[in-house]
UniProtKB/Swiss-Prot annotation:
This is Glycosyltransferase 1 domain-containing protein 1. Belongs to the glycosyltransferase group 1 family. Glycosyltransferase 4 subfamily. It is found in: Secreted. It comes from the Eukaryota. Its main location: secreted. GO terms for molecular function: glycosyltransferase activity. It comes from Xenopus tropicalis. The gene is glt1d1. Glycans are attached at N246, N322.
């Protein structure tokens, strides 16, 4: 099949990473898969694309932002829930209506978690039978040639050899990711313990908010903003870090958290539904509800080696069992067959 795949493709963000991985799964099964950025498309462009390029199937990530472009375009399509669908867009009446119409037309829908399926089935009961649960598959390949010391030096992070505790927070710079949530508390901690640093790594998604972040970080020490870097380099940074941090206001399923688990790096995450769906507190990671609690838990991680060992070991086992890249590949290669002309769910 020739598949038109629509997703919001901001570089080095979760959606982009997920889309590229699924595209690879489909092409491995012999399909032609053309990935387009839904963030910059117009409806008329999609109609022209479908007719000129002779696509016979479609796939989308995010029901509203991408799904609306395939409605009524006469090609069968499948859909994948994004975190924004359930956490944000569902609160808007018009967006919610469009999402319901997309679900009506979609041959199949994928949810990353049972919770997302439950929320969707409650909102759109007519689509319950179409929703398949497939957690994100994780495959990490950290760069072996990455120069970590040069990376730290370029970021302005000065440290004594062997004494650095680097925390990394990976996100596209937008308000929902709340990257400044821990900034002031972390700066106070850094003042007392100069070997702790927080690196916020990611692309400028919201220019206005990015400027706010830059201005804030100019006022404090110990917290650094670093532009996005290639995926393999980013994974090399995670692997050398003391812990990965997530402070988002809402999440679908954070690929960065799962990658850290796979790389055997402990995770400290804000206690929100998207994070607690994949982290069991003090078992596969640590969940915090306030900046003060984050520091308390971080200190425990530093002083209780058995806690760190248990979390890292259990998290690695969890990822291997529940986020298999091979199982994800099998799922999408099977589901996509529902888009053949006479395919049924």
């Amino acid at each position: 099949m020739k598949i038109l795949f629509l997703a919001c493709l901001r570089a080095h963000t979760g959606n982009s990473t997920t889309a590229l991985r699924i595209k690879d799964h489909l092409e491995a099964a012999g399909h032609t898969c053309v990935l387009k950025d839904a963030a910059i498309l117009e409806s008329s462009e999609v109609e022209t694309l479908i007719s000129q390029e002779k696509f016979n199937a479609g796939l989308i990530i995010q029901l509203y932002k991408a799904g609306r472009f395939l409605m009524g375009n006469r090609i069968p399509f499948g859909a994948i829930f994004g975190g924004t669908d359930i956490n944000e867009d569902v609160k808007n009446e018009e967006k919610c209506r469009v999402m319901g119409a997309v679900l009506e037309e979609a041959r199949f829908v994928v949810a990353f978690t049972h919770k997302i399926k439950e929320l969707a089935a409650t909102k759109w009961p007519h689509a319950k039978h179409k929703i398949h649960i497939q957690p994100q598959g994780i495959l990490t390949k950290p760069s072996k040639s990455f120069d970590y010391e040069a990376f730290l030096q370029n970021a302005g992070i000065r440290h004594k050899s062997g004494h650095l505790h680097l925390y990394v927070l990976i996100c596209g710079l937008r308000r929902v990711k709340d990257p400044l949530y821990l900034a002031e508390m972390f700066a106070k901690w850094h003042e007392k313990e100069p070997n702790v640093y927080l690196a916020i790594i990611g692309p400028m998604v919201d220019p206005v908010f990015t400027k706010e972040v830059e201005n804030k970080l100019e006022e404090i020490d110990g917290v650094y903003l670093i532009k996005e870097i290639p995926q393999s380099d980013l994974q090399a940074v995670i692997k050398r870090s003391f812990a990965l941090v997530n402070s988002s206001l809402s999440e679908g399923m954070s690929a960065a958290i799962l990658e850290a688990m796979d790389l055997e790096v402990p995770v400290l995450a804000r206690d929100i539904p998207g994070n607690s769906a994949i982290i069991k507190h003090e078992d596969t990671g640590l969940l915090f509800s306030t900046p003060q609690e984050f520091v308390q838990l971080s200190k425990r991680l530093m002083t209780e080696p058995e806690l760190k060992r248990r979390i890292v070991s259990n998290a690695k086992r969890y990822v291997n069992s529940n986020h298999s890249w091979e199982l994800e590949r099998d799922t999408y290669q099977t589901l996509i067959l529902n888009l053949q002309v006479n395919g049924n769910i």
